[in-house]
Amino acid sequence: MYIIPAVDMKEGKCVQLIQGDPTKRHVEYDNPDEIAKMWIENGAEMLHLVDLDGAIDGERVNLPCVKKIIQESKVPVQMGGGIRTIQDVEELVDLGINKVIIGTVAVQNPDFVEQLAKKVGSDKIMVALDAKDGKVVIKGWKEKTEYTPVQMGKILEEKGAGSILFTNVDSEGLLNGINITPTKELVDNLNIPIIASGGVTTIEDLIEFKKIGVAGVVVGSALYKNNFKLQDAINTVNNFKI
């Protein structure tokens, strides 16, 4: 199981938001590429980049940071944030992004996933599923759909999604710990890899995710607030036998 540090970028800086709110930030650093390098030096085997400006305003102001991170890092990079068109996806794949994360547009139009999979290959397509109160939410968590994560996950898998990034919004960015059940339901019902995200506060949380069989866990706030050291987490999780 990969432990994947999040590098969230806003206006060229590395930030961590609380509950996705651009006005509420846990932390802020000037050089996202330096942060990415630090995580790799501390053992990260994969990075999770989020372009918050792309996600919030449709602007790609963080592209220079992204290019720098890709050039300097020798680990796979997955990236999301405001990716809405085939052109967006192709540009990022050409740039060297290993997995491009799409969200709302995939849930609203699963056929789009099929088009993308044909164009760049399923392995490059990761769909972000966000859930609140047991239902998938879209548009920056503002709009609730009628689908459960498993229902939507099955549709997306059928359409060619290569993996799912699942965020339980109820716990995201609050440092309250995790509710493992919705993630376990996805792992149990889908055949593609599930990457978990949201609410990790302790190494024990990571162990819980390993027990249910997720492929990786994205960790943000807990690392930036120094709840635990990345290297310690990697060692503990790798040594834990199920």
Curated annotation (Swiss-Prot):
InterPro entries: Aldolase_TIM (IPR013785), His_biosynth (IPR006062), HisA_bact_arch (IPR006063), Isoase_HisA-like (IPR044524), Isoase_HisA-like_bact (IPR023016), RibuloseP-bd_barrel (IPR011060). It is found in: Cytoplasm. One of its GO terms (biological process) is L-histidine biosynthetic process. It catalyses: 1-(5-phospho-beta-D-ribosyl)-5-[(5-phospho-beta-D-ribosylamino)methylideneamino]imidazole-4-carboxamide = 5-[(5-phospho-1-deoxy-D-ribulos-1-ylimino)methylamino]-1-(5-phospho-beta-D-ribosyl)imidazole-4-carboxamide. Pathway: Amino-acid biosynthesis; L-histidine biosynthesis; L-histidine from 5-phospho-alpha-D-ribose 1-diphosphate: step 4/9. The active site is at residues 8, 130. It comes from the Archaea. Keywords: Amino-acid biosynthesis, Cytoplasm, Histidine biosynthesis, Isomerase. Signal peptide: none annotated. One of its GO terms (cellular component) is cytoplasm. Its EC number is 5.3.1.16. The keyword Amino-acid biosynthesis applies. The keyword ATP-binding does not apply. Gene3D superfamilies: Aldolase class I. GO terms for molecular function: 1-(5-phosphoribosyl)-5-[(5-phosphoribosylamino)methylideneamino]imidazole-4-carboxamide isomerase activity. Pfam families: His_biosynth (PF00977). Belongs to the HisA/HisF family. PANTHER family: 1-(5-PHOSPHORIBOSYL)-5-[(5-PHOSPHORIBOSYLAMINO)METHYLIDENEAMINO] IMIDAZOLE-4-CARBOXAMIDE ISOMERASE. This is 1-(5-phosphoribosyl)-5-[(5-phosphoribosylamino)methylideneamino] imidazole-4-carboxamide isomerase. The lineage of its organism: Archaea, Methanobacteriati, Methanobacteriota, Methanomada group, Methanococci.
